Amino acid sequence: MPTSMLWAVDLFGRVYTLSTAGQYWELCKDVQLEFKRVSAATQCCWGIACDNQVYLYVCSSDVPIRHREEAYENQRWNPMGGFCEKLLPSDRWSWSDVSGLQHRPLDGVALPSPYWEWESDWYVDENFGGEPTEKGGWTYAMDFPATYTRDKKWNSCVRRRKWIRYRRYKSRDTWAKIPSKDDPKELPDPFNDLSVGGWEITEEPVGRLSVWAVSLQGKVWYRENVSHPNPEGSSWSLVDTPGEVVQISCGPHDLIWATLWEGQALVREGICRNNPKGNSWSIVEPPGSENGIMHVSAGVSVVWAITKDRKVWFRRGVNSHNPCGTSWIEMVGEMTMVNVGLNDQVWGISCEDRAVYFRQGVTPSELSGKTWKAIVVGRESDRSHSGSSSSLLSAGCFFGEEVRGSGTESAPSDTDASSEVERQGPERSLPKESLDNSRNLKGSSSKGHESTRNTEDPMENACLAEGQAKAPKTSGPDECHGPAPTPAELPWTNIDLKEPKKASNQPAAGFPETSGLSSLGLFPMGMEEPYGADDHPLWAWVSGGGCAVEAGSALKWFTVQSGLSPSVQTLSLSITPAQTAAWRKQIFQQLTERTKRELESFRHYEQAVEQSVWVKTGALQWWCDWKPHKWVDVRVALEQFTGHDGARDSILFIYYVVHEEKKYLHVFLNEVTVLVPVLNEAKHSFALYTPERTRQRWPVRLAATTEQDMNDWLTLLSLSCCESRKVHGRPSLQAIWSVTCKGDIFVSEPSPDLEAHEHLLPCDQMFWRQMGGHLRIIEANSRGVVWGIGYDHTAWVYTGGYGGGCFQGLASSTSNIYTQSDVKSVYIYENQRWNPVTGYTSRGLPTDRYMWSDVTGLQECTKAGTKPPSLQWTWVSDWYVDFSVLGGTDQEGWQYASDFPASYHGYKTMKDFVRRRCWARKCKLVTSGPWLEVAPIALSDVSIIPESADANGRGHNIALWAVSDKGDVLCRLGVSELNPAGSSWLHVGTDQPFASVSIGACYQVWAVARDGSAFYRGSVSPSQPAGDCWYHIPSPPKQKLTQVSVGQTSVYALDENGNLWYRAGITPSYPQGSSWEHVSNNVRKVSVGPLDQVWVIANKVQGSHGLSRGTVCRRMGVQPREPKGQGWDYGIGGGWDHISVRANATRAPRNMSRDQEAHGPGPVCC
């Protein structure tokens, strides 16, 4: 789970953040402002300061926020002077936008606010539809509203060119004031409340936010055009309400609730993709007539509320179809406010002790949770206090008395112990008023939502005889600490508290004064702390809109050891998990060596049993190879025997019945090349391949009744195959990695003769074993760095382990295995045909496709009948319309065409008689494997530099390039064998979004844009990892490229039609090459290795018995003088979707024949 932030404001207006992986509240970097309340999203936070102005805090990121400004220069031809700026009176402006309706001179385009800066000056865009234009960037047409082309024709009477300029948002990690322009709609009064949400509105474009605000006059305002490229938005618009609003809350989806002065709640209805502001309000009555609602918080499927008597309420039956819900349920506890974050997790601030509480037990099946638990972590400034007290460990009375004192008490609860540890210490710096209040509160108790108890500090008991003042410690939400007034004395809007005075810094009685103790009363930069060193902060507001906490996740906010002082706690925390893991590994290594020494003395004894046999039997289903092709019940037996030399081998027997005659089929597991799970909605099945069955494209398919049974058999058979081939442990540095269309990861160890020119090993004899995890793309390097990308664009890095998933605990490493999740979408299509009576309906012709089908129209797929890809996946969303399909859509998501097998477009014409609409639904898989997440940027492609075995690059960092899901090109810094995840991203500017990137062995970087154009990055080197500029490379004629792969000297590219192209003419003096040469068709993915070897995933391969889709293929005959090769060698398939051979730098033995010697030396880096 990636780290995220919980935001909070204390009573003094200071903004703090708490990481889900942290144990301290960190003060916001910009401390000049004091805030009343904040509302957070994933990448930003909005707030209302004490000056009643709205501010925006955008978190820093390696990827900048860039916005492209465009202007078009228009010219018309005349017989006197040719093309000039003199236009006809009916023409558009000489400088305009793309439509020509708006005047847009270059000097008239200004920055929207002081928080933006220009990246460069205006320059001409010489890219037109993926093809480079002539010098000057002009495109020509017969008239302005016509279609433009790159080439000038005899009837080209007008021309235009596009000027572009990028601006960058520079206000990161600081509060930026939202500008208020002088216009008639300027705010009449200051803001009182603000809420951010709506980033997951169904069908909403990624990055859009909904910002709602309430003024002191009770009016509701909406911020227009807030999105990731435009974080400030454009303007405020007034939203009519039936009454005066006090407070408003916007959930991540389409829930918006507000509270009225009269105590009722307002619910906004009609929110959708095309209308994020909604269209009407509905009134919801409060739980009781005596106490109205004063605070609400909306989530994804929940709404929580606080009434005027501080009671907490949960709204039942809330969802997108019924935003008003059904009824109120009273919850335990009294809060001043609550906030619902991501995944419907809830935080609140207690009205008694002003502490932040987290609602535990919130799950999709139990949205109300189970209990409140206090967050007991301290502030980051408290680290020096707890750390300096560690020097007192040498004082015997301190450590001994504390242990004796703690032993006389009963074990406290987690919350009590955490609060007690947080407030203990060898020196008290509480103000005198606070100590007096503590004495007055001694022995008192109040009614609350959780059981509380009073405990005394054992440290103070030990030092009471020395004259140290004893202050009883209180904990729990029902006790008040420090100068906090009672709830009745707290104003709702204006909080004006005086800072408590500091107590004099004197050393504790009985302890020598040390530098560590004296530092407890000092604060950095002369800044006074509003709390004592042992006080917990008093909170006024909390926001979890950007805090992602999954149900059941272990947080460090509550796990503080009970009965230990801060000094002992600091000591225990100083032992890092890495040190603990190293200590365990050392013990394991010593035990292993001892076992070897003890067994060495008995090796000369003869074995008592020369040969052993082990058999496992079970019942499975087998897909019959002959008619009628169907699943039949069979008995299977795995017989494993150990030979005289200790080698193990296994045979799998499949017993079946044909026409009442018993027969069997046997497979030697040392001949099995791969065991692969099969994507099946209704069966837990897997396939077994041998070299012969790989050539036939007809594997042995088996199915189990349960997923656990299938995993058991799959694990056992895979382990037996690995033992037969003596393959164990983590993959080698030269391993070949691949991914199936199901997301399963497979790895193969290359033999020395795999890339030999003579007597090479056929691909169908390669042995593949499965690794735990789930990925869509994988990329490897010969120095052991392996990265992968999931279906949800999450980046993962290989940890060095092996196994995981179904192999956990049996054929898996004990360390470096972590939980991994992935999310993908399932798509179905709604088809309709037009008729003159009723228009478009779901009644088609008898020859038409199904009205609910897949993308091909050949298979019927309804909403109710469509299931997740396999039983391992679970639905995590409802069906929604997908507006991002190729060709565009109208406002309702429809695409139109003349007939179903034709091309679709997003607008209706007179000849369009059919239409379709794409529906999507997300599903999630949770597994485990040797992978760690690389946060926080989502990626769509990644490339690691391939290095040959004799390359002298061990001293340099490993070059890694990637493309984000938004199309940004990134370069990863700090990647090495010891740190495969790297340290940070370096953004590489582009003029358009990219789709693919690849770096070669000599730091030659090639990339493909989303419009199909190719680019080469110049001057990339270890000292200049990002290079200097992009060179536009013309694509193959009438083709749009989708992927590129670069080896040592070879560059291969793939177009959208499955054609494979080779870039010819690449030399050290001209690394861009001269032309594209066609190599093959029927290709889905390509991977070029450090030896310029070429491997692909073929779309279709015909075998002797069947057809396979997605087959691993190797290009044969690739040599320095024949870089394109001469044919294909077909390997494992089908169902494979990605392969990476960029780690395989294993050269063939040097028994070169005369023919090989005639080819001359190897390739030279460009």
From Swiss-Prot:
Residues 407-418, 437-446 have a biased composition (Polar residues). It holds the Pfam family Tectonin. It is found in: Cytoplasmic vesicle, Autophagosome membrane; Lysosome membrane. The gene is Tecpr1. Belongs to the TECPR1 family. InterPro entries: Beta-propeller_rpt_TECPR, Peroxin/Ferlin, PH-like_dom_sf, TECPR1-like_DysF, Tectonin_beta-propeller. It comes from Rattus norvegicus. Its main location: membrane. This is Tectonin beta-propeller repeat-containing protein 1.
